[in-house]
Amino acid sequence: MAGAKEIKTKIASVKNTQKITSAMEMVAASKMRRAQERMAASRPYAESMRKVIGHVAQGSLEYKHPYLEVREAKRVGYIVVATDRGLCGGLNVNLFKKVVSDVKSWKEQGAEFEFCPIGARSVQFFKSFGGQVSAHASGLGDAPKLADLIGTVRVMLDAYNEGKLDRLYVVFNKFVNTMTQTPVIEQLLPLPKSEDDEVAHRWDYIYEPDPKALLDTLLVRYVESQVYQGVVENIASEQAARMVAMKAATDNAGTLIDDLQLVYNKARQAAITQELSEIVSGASAV
């Protein structure tokens, strides 16, 4: 059994760690609330944009935009949104597993693939995973701006426009609630048709003055908005996962302190008993 002094030092060390994890939990909780507010503010726009584009994809257009045409998938692109920092449980690992599984299914169909990782952890993973990394972004912070993403997204859009990509997906952790964050893969291009009940009441839009000029701008803006929403959702998921992970670490530290305190008490009691035995033995000898 370790000495009482050694155990006491270990208890002090665990207590210091507990203070750090507790502080990180509170910081993550505060950041999560702000991230949720940003996510809630941008979600209606992203969902409305998705709905409008879904109807556009269903409509009978005189001008057929390349983003509406479905072609054979020979090369697939992924914009993968992960975190810049760790200490957020299995958030990134679960996301990467989902991407790897999807890549495997496309690989079996003979398709090639390339990646656009967003977030330092995503960049690190896909540079070692294999496959072409066409563009990447990291260090976006807790309050990213669309302008920070446009350059990276445009690289993938240009590849699609040039026929180097036949499918484009965005992958991120969708924020469900504080305890649940789900990795999702959403198709960006070709534009997915709306699965809404409103499709039953189908209509066409009238484009003024020119459908080509409008759609060229609108569809690019749609892709950018969906990627931005994915980044915002992922930040909220990151802070929620970190808060839960740090709470678990704080609780585990408390349990470990209790266990060490018990061991310390036993060691101290054994030392006192030993001293008493020696005193009694010495007195008997006299």
UniProtKB/Swiss-Prot annotation:
It is a peripheral membrane protein. Its main location: membrane. It comes from the Bacteria. It is found in: Cell inner membrane. One of its GO terms (cellular component) is plasma membrane. GO terms for molecular function: ATP binding; proton-transporting ATP synthase activity, rotational mechanism. Keywords: ATP synthesis, Cell inner membrane, Cell membrane, CF(1), Hydrogen ion transport, Ion transport, Membrane, Transport. Pfam families: ATP-synt (PF00231). One of its GO terms (biological process) is proton motive force-driven plasma membrane ATP synthesis. F-type ATPases have 2 components, CF(1) - the catalytic core - and CF(0) - the membrane proton channel. CF(1) has five subunits: alpha(3), beta(3), gamma(1), delta(1), epsilon(1). CF(0) has three main subunits: a, b and c. NCBIfam families: ATPsyn_F1gamma, PRK05621.1-1. Produces ATP from ADP in the presence of a proton gradient across the membrane. The gamma chain is believed to be important in regulating ATPase activity and the flow of protons through the CF(0) complex. Belongs to the ATPase gamma chain family. This is ATP synthase gamma chain. The lineage of its organism: Bacteria, Pseudomonadati, Pseudomonadota, Gammaproteobacteria, Alteromonadales. The gene is atpG.
